[in-house]
A protein has these predicted regions:
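Catalytic cores and adjacent binding grooves of peptidoglycan-active enzymes
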Residues: 3-8, 91-179
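Mature N-terminal segment immediately following signal peptide/propeptide cleavage
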Residues: 4-11, 15-21
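Loop/turn elements at helix/coil->beta-strand transitions in domains of secreted/extracellular proteins
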Residues: 14, 66-70, 124-128
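Active-site acidic/histidine clusters and adjacent loop/turn architecture
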Residues: 22-73
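Cysteine-centered nucleophilic/redox motifs
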Residues: 56-61, 78-81, 106
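Acidic helix-start/capping segments at beta-turn-to-alpha-helix junctions
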Residues: 69-84
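Charged, often glycine-rich, active-site loop that binds/positions anionic groups
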Residues: 80-96
Length: 179
């Protein structure tokens, strides 16, 4: 099992294609490069990112069927940057997973954010945020608790989980039968 990510940073215009895992083992030098690539570009600060995020993003990309690079909108975000963004938008969480190195905002040019959201929700690896009307539409993927925002309707969740087995709660607040 070899896992390679092909990334493009929307802000720095950098591109990185890197194998970060081989035979079930993370490659330390690759993780260090990913930490630098996903740095807070406003402050040029990096953090040790949670490698489970790379596995989750890799799986999302695989399931999407795309061969296009993943466009990174945001990786690590320092507390100072997070506070700056919070002062401009109510959509920025006070205790953001970005500040912990556990989140990535992304899009893939030839995959709709609706499809990326559906795949992310089905994976149940963490949080999935959906921002279809941002300047550049994107999804937020993190390896925190399993949740999605905005919440999906009961009909949407049933279409993704026909057996009802999901940790996601529909917008009506009533869990599906397999919860």
């Amino acid at each position: 099992d070899t896992r390679t990510l092909d990334l493009y940073n929307n802000h720095t215009k950098e591109r990185l294609t890197i194998t970060f895992k081989k035979n079930g083992r993370y490659i330390p030098s690759a993780l260090a490069e990913l930490n630098r690539f996903l740095r807070d570009w406003r402050r040029n600060e990096s953090i040790t990112m949670d490698p489970r995020l790379f596995d989750t993003v890799w799986e999302l990309h695989q399931r999407s069927g795309s061969r296009q690079p993943i466009h990174v909108v945001c990786g690590y975000r320092s507390l100072a940057t997070n506070n700056l963004l919070r002062s401009r938008s109510s959509a920025v969480a006070k205790h953001s997973q970005h500040t912990l190195g556990k989140a990535m905002d992304l899009n893939i040019p030839d995959v709709s954010v609706d499809k990326l959201r559906a795949i992310g929700v089905q994976m149940q690896n963490g949080g999935v945020g959906w921002y279809p009307s941002a300047n550049s539409p994107f999804v937020h993927i993190d390896v925190g608790n399993v949740r999605a925002w905005p919440r999906l309707s009961r009909t949407q969740l049933v279409s993704l989980f026909p057996d009802g087995k999901t940790a996601h709660i529909p917008a009506d607040g009533k869990p599906l039968p397999g919860y």
